[in-house]
Every structure is written in C-alpha cells, then in structure tokens.
Amino acid sequence: MFAPLLKKLFGSKNEREVKRMLKAVQSVNALEEQMLSLSDEQLRSKTEEFKARLEKGETLDQILPEAFAVCREAGKRVMGMRHFDVQLIGGMTLHEGRIAEMRTGEGKTLVATLAVYLNALAGKGVHVVTVNDYLARRDANWMRPLYEFLGLSVGIVTPFQPPEEKRAAYASDITYGTNNEFGFDYLRDNMAFSLQEKNQRELNFAVIDEVDSILIDEARTPLIISGQAEDSSKLYQQINLLIPRLTQHIEEEEGVVTQEGHFSIDEKTRQVELNEQGHQYIEELLTQAGLLAEGESLYSAHNLGLLTHVYSGLRAHKLFHRNVEYIVQNNQVLLIDEHTGRTMPGRRLSEGLHQAIEAKEGLQIQPESQTLASTTFQNYFRLYKKLAGMTGTADTEAFEFQQIYSLPVVVIPTNKPLARKDFNDLVYLTQEEKFAAIIADIKECRNQGRPVLVGTATIESSEYVSRLLEAEGFEHKVLNAKHHDKEAEIIAQAGRPGAVTIATNMAGRGTDILLGGNWEVEVAALENATEEQIAQIKADWQKRHQQVLEAGGLHVIASERHESRRIDNQLRGRAGRQGDPGSSRFYLSLEDSLMRIFASDRVKNFMKALGMESGEAIEHRMVTNAIEKAQRKVEGRNFDMRKQLLEYDDVANEQRKVIYHMRNSLLAADEIGQTIAEFRQEALDAAISAHIPPQSLPEQWDIPGLEAVLYSDFGTRLPIQQWLDEDEKLYEETLREKILQALLDAYNEKEDMAGAEALRSFEKQIVLRVLDDLWKDHLSTMDHLRHGIHLRGYAQKNPKQEYKRESFTLFQDLLESIKRDSIRVLSHVQVRREDPAEEEARLRHEAEELAKRMQFQHAEVSALDQPEEEPAEVEGQPDVAVASVRTEPKIGRNEPCPCGSGKKYKHCHGQVQ
C-alpha cells in the first residue's frame, strides 16, 4: 500500500544506487583539469604510482577517482574517446562486482576499461570474457593501445594456441578470451602432470560481456573434456530404421483421443514418452531386428542402454528439425544456438542424441565419448574472487543473477534519452496473414526510405520471408546460420536508406547497425585510400545518415515472440542507439509456437468472438498480457531447470574441489613419500581388517585370503601362516606391524634398484594417473546415478537427498580406491632407470597422444539427463600402468637369471641401467 508512495519519495533502489555513484563521478570530474595538464610520460607514470600506493596499504576504492580520471584522459589521448559520466557509473558498478545493464550503443567496451584498469593495478590479473573469439580479438586489439599507453600488458587466449603463447597471455595484466576457452583451460590445468604445464593464475577478477548470454543462456550447458568410448554407430543406424514405424499418440486437452499411437510429445518440456502400446511394439521390432532376445524386456538391466538408444532416436526424429535446431554443413550436424541463431561448431548433444541425428541425416556417425573432466559455467565463474558483467538486457533476470551468483543488477542511465517508439503487438489468426502484414510494413518503410531489420526465430522463417520478398521483387539480404560468414558485411550496410535485412537472432550480439551504413567498412575495402576518397565517402555517408534520420531511423520487425522477454528486448535494441530515432513492432499469430503451446484457449476464443475476418489484426491489452504471462511462465520454468541443475552439480562441484585440491597438492610437492606411506598404511589396515576382524579369535582369521590380497594388492608373497605357526606370540597388532615392515622392505629394495630420486618422480606420476582414471570413472558413475535418480520419487523418496547420500558414498569409495590402486600399481610395477631426456620425451609423447584423443564439448543437457556412457574397464589398475605391471612371479636379485646365462639376476637382466 505504501510502497508506491515510498518509491516516489525516496526513489527506487536502482535510482538510489545511481545517485550514490554520482558523488564519486563528481570527484573524477574534479580531477579532469589536473590530468589534462600532465604530459604523456607523467600520465603513464601514474600507473606505477598507484601500484606503489596499493603496496603501502591503500585500497582500490581509495584510488578509484584518480585511476578513473587517468583512464579517461588516456582514452581521450589514445582513442579519441572520452568516458561520459554515465560510463563512469558503469565502471564503478563493474568494480563493485555488479552487473551493469546498458542500452545498445552506450559503449560497454569502453566502460569496461575503467574497472579493468583499476583492478589490474593489483597485479593479480583481470579476465575479460566475451561470447566468441571474434569479439575477444576485436575488443583486445581495439583497447590494447589504451592499456599499453598506461603500462599494462594485454593477452588473448584462443583455441589451439601454443602453450608458451597461452601461458604468456595468462601472465599478462589483462587477458581477453571466450567463456569456453577460460573454462576449458581451467579443466586442462587440472589434468596437467606438472606445475609448468598449468596456464591460469588464481582466478581474481572477471568482467563478462553479454553476461546474460553466458551465465543464463549457457548455464545448463556443461563444459566437457572427453575421450572416445566404444563405437556403437551400427546400433544407431539399426535403431534409426525402426523409429519411422512408430506413430504419435495425439490427445486433445479435453481427453479426446484424435489419433492412436505409440508415443506422445510434450512440446512445453520438449520431451517424448513411449506409452504401453509403444513399449510392446518397439520390443517386437527390436526382437525382429535381432537386437533384443526373444521374450526379453526392454527394461531389463542389461537392456537399458538399448532403451536409451530408442529414446535418442525418437527425440532426433520428433523434436529436432533440420534448419530449426540444427543445419547440415560439410556432412556435419551443426547445432544452432536458439538465443543467437548462430551455429555452434564443435558442440555436440549428449546422451547419444547427436549420433541419432547423424543417423537420421544419413551422415557418418561420430564415436561416443567418455567424460574426462567437466564443470558448468555456474560453478566455474563462482570460483573468481570478484565477478562483474555487462549487457543490454539483464533486468528481467535480476532475481536469478542475485540468487545464483550474488550479482546485483544496476540499470545505467542512457547518455541521451531513448527516442525509439515500441508499437503494440499485432496478433493475427494465421501465420499466412501475419507474414502478409509484415511484407506490407516492409513496403511502406522502403517507400519512406527507412532501413528495415526483420527478426525471425528460425532459419526456416527467415528463408520464407526471403521468398515472399523475392516474389515482390524487393532486394534484400539474409543473415542466418547458413550465411554467417557475411555477417560483418551485411550488418555494415543494414542501416542504408531502404535496406531490408532479414536476420535470425544472430544480429543481437556485439553488432551496431549505423544509420546510413558504416563508412569505415567502405574505406577499409579500398586499398591505400587517398584523403580525397575518404572525404568523399564520409560526405556520401553524411547525406545517407541525414536521410535515414529524417525518415524515422531503423524499423525493427519481429515475426514472433521468443520464449524469453530478454531476447525480444535485444532485437528491439538494434533500433534507437545513442538517442537515434527508430521503431519496433512484433507481428504474431495464434499458430506461433509460443501462442500455441502456452497462451490459453481463452485468447483464441476471445479473438473468434470478436468476429475477426481474414487479414484483420487485434491490438488488445488482454492479448498482450496473455503473451507476457506465457513468457514469464517459460522463464520461470527455465530458471527452475537451471536451479535444479546447479543443485545437482553443486554436489559434484564439492567433490571436484577436493580432487583438484588433492591434485594441486601432489603437483606442488617436491616428493610425496609421506603421502605414499599414508596410502600404504590405510590400504593395509583395510586389507587386514577385512580378513582379521578386530578383536576376533584366531579361528576366525582368513589367512589364505589375506596372503592372496597381499600379493594381488601389494605385490609381495608373505608366509603369514608360517609366521603364525613359528611364533605363538604373534597377535593381531604385532602381525600388522610385521606385515607392514615386510612390505616396506620390499619397496625399499625397489628403491635401491631404481634410485630414490627416480622413484619419487615416478610415484607422483603414478598417483596422478590413478587419480585421473578413477575420477574419470567416478564422473561416469555420477552421470548414471543422476540420470536415473528421479525414479526414486516413485518410492516416496526425495531424489535430491538420495543423490547427495549416494554420491557421498561413491566419493568415499573413490578416495579409498585412489589409495588402494596407487599402492597396487606402485607395488607391482617394475621400475628401471631411464635417461631424463628420454623420460621427458616419452611423457611428452603420451601427453600429445592423450590430447589427440580428447574432445572439448559444450554439450546440451537437462537438469537430470547426462550421457549414458559405459565406464572404461580399468580392472583395478589405470590403463597407463598396464605395460609396467608384472604378470610373472617376482625374481629375487640373487636368484639365477631366467634367461639361462648362469649369472645372478642382479648381474644380468636385473642390472640397474
């Protein structure tokens, strides 16, 4: 009741934040004259002065006004650009670890320089994160002169970069790169076998450009480094032939069945489900194809992999459509990002779905993969000490940013008032009527000399509009995932008078449509342009620019609403940049996906009750409210899915932290002899306790079993029964000590043969390899657990609690296995001296071979579904150590050599090299 009154009196929270920062802006402005009077050298020396003051105890907040004033003055001298007051507010917002929402064309790239410069002074590194490599290079090279003028180094991390370059980039004061590359480098660092191989420093401060795209749109997409699993391409092809024989079961909302079938589709959740009839029929088909034994159930434990293939095939055929969710290019299935409309090369769907689509399209089926390391952006970016972000559209997701990342959103005022007109939506009964109205609107704008940007949700829609325009004889450009290579050229001319550009959501990120076109692109196209040519190009552009301004600026037409209001706002934001005139209009129909799936029948009945005729549109608040309600419903559902994914991944993340900490401790240690001793003690205690229960009678002891496990796990044959027969005073504790001493003696003998230094290095390599292999298998087991944990709900159990409980048990088993298997490999392995150069070359070759087999995936998953992969068969020992494990009995050093030479083993084949 009093909220509106209080807001009127004191302003909104956002207004109060902006007002607070305006005081600091005044402090920066007060220093402008002083900075103007400094020479270039004096201005540059301010950086070293700030660093010295920080070392003496001053804080970044205390030097902020001066640092911002220095950065602003350097921007004027080097770039010819002066930071506006609102940009200073944006810089302060970033420095405070918040998200700055800034409209299109307000200079986010320049804003970032303020917070980046200030935080780079601490010498701990600053990461600037972009959504693609093009923007990373563009922004780094664009701002490099400014940073280097101020004495700071700039690096760029890119895929397939030589290790030396990558390490140098991370050692720079400021590092630019994509979210994918930063995330993959983090995972790769935690697979390194020496500290020298690691690239990243401690994660200090990151500024994320297009933060909503990375932290929200990409949140459900884990980063995965994977190796190849078994090949099952033939099975995908066989299943693919069976899927078309299944029919869809269609049922109206009133429960009336309009078509009997084998499966149903839920368009809201994008899920497909076999019914009872479908299960029986697919079992018959699988049996006929020889894939399922006669009389067996598809739900038998050993057939669950087959069931997964069936569902993957169903989803590939019924939920994924060519030119909508993916395109086929160069005999490869390339996924399309629903938020940007761009293709995502290298990204593959998990759970065998990508292979099923390849089978559907008749392409070569790529092998499945097994996860070696994974994380999510949600958990990776929360590792930074301080995080900040910039975007043009964050306010609609402010609650999620605060809940998940503890990042408040501050809406930064525009430098000039927004002059764009956003017209009401026009809703038609059919898509045909809607597209006819769009063509009519385009005609009108062309006659006025206004440029038009037509935004579509899919490639199909963009090509349909293109065909309609061709039929009318209108010249136009199409920008979608098929023509992305021409993006810069098309966008550069999209603001010319009368230009018509049809684009999917691609045109929403990192691009500005300049009214009149982009004269700089024209100049760049000329080789060695003269001053006269440049002047003429500028003059021509000025005429076109004025012509478009007088006509009303850029007009944005959207052919349908997106699931997210944020994506709609991004499209609108293409028009009206920096106070320019412009307008936007959304054209909808009752046949659009969002309206069909989420808007209630009430809207349809309401429109029909009005007696609307063909071609008529409706502009009514009730319809607009229904659309916004549908969008909020979808946004809420997507938020719940992301939150659920995070809750599950948080469990794995805590385990990941423990394993990576253990790994880093091993890498940092000069030698791990004490760790090996602890592993041996714990593994031995567990083995003895399993065969000699505490406080048990000698009659209950399993001595043969203990002797067997000591040989299998510790590589030493010990006559325990003989000891007990010869010494009646031996009891549980003294026997334990005697066994431990015998194992130590055997291991010390191995150390004498190989040399202490060589064995210490070997121990570290073995423990790291065992840890990596068992962690890989643990990830696979966790995937399987998460995939089926929702079924516990049918037993009245909480799936999340069950997942936490079982994953904790699995993790305890993992830690025990690391200790036991490390000792097992070290006990069995035959160590020989090796030339250091040869050893380094061998390890390097192994690392290169491993890298060749790795795949870097950013695979789409749901909160509960992960890849169904068979865990690698390790049989108690890591693959890398198999070649080193003895299969023959151990030969004593003083025994005759088995080669038949007559010499003792230690003087023949057992001689230390």
Swiss-Prot record:
GO annotation terms (biological process): intracellular protein transmembrane transport; protein import; protein targeting; protein transport by the Sec complex
Gene3D superfamilies: Helical scaffold and wing domains of SecA, P-loop containing nucleotide triphosphate hydrolases, SecA, preprotein cross-linking domain
Alphabetized CDD domains for the sequence: DEXDc_SecA, SF2_C_secA
Source organism superkingdom: Bacteria
Membrane topology: Peripheral membrane protein
Subcellular location as annotated: Cell inner membrane; Cytoplasm
Signal sequence segment: none
Cellular component GO terms held in the UniProt record: cell envelope Sec protein transport complex; cytosol; plasma membrane
EC class name: translocase
Biased composition (Basic residues): 903-913
Cofactor (UniProt): Zn(2+)
Region spans: Disordered: 864-913
Record's keyword terms, sorted: ATP-binding, Cell inner membrane, Cell membrane, Cytoplasm, Membrane, Metal-binding, Nucleotide-binding, Protein transport, Translocase, Translocation, Transport, Zinc
Enzyme Commission code(s) on record: 7.4.2.8
List of residues binding Zn(2+): C897, C899, C908, H909
Single GO term (MF): metal ion binding
Cofactor note: May bind 1 zinc ion per subunit.
Catalytically driven reaction(s): ATP + H2O + cellular proteinSide 1 = ADP + phosphate + cellular proteinSide 2
SMART domains: SecA_DEAD, SecA_PP_bind
NCBIfam families named in the record: PRK12904.1, secA
Subunit structure: Monomer and homodimer. Part of the essential Sec protein translocation apparatus which comprises SecA, SecYEG and auxiliary proteins SecDF-YajC and YidC.
Family: Belongs to the SecA family.
Summary of the function given for this chain in its UniProt record: Part of the Sec protein translocase complex. Interacts with the SecYEG preprotein conducting channel. Has a central role in coupling the hydrolysis of ATP to the transfer of proteins into and across the cell membrane, serving both as a receptor for the preprotein-SecB complex and as an ATP-driven molecular motor driving the stepwise translocation of polypeptide chains across the membrane.
Name this polypeptide is given: Protein translocase subunit SecA
Organism this protein belongs to: Stutzerimonas stutzeri (strain A1501) (Pseudomonas stutzeri)
Chain's gene name: secA
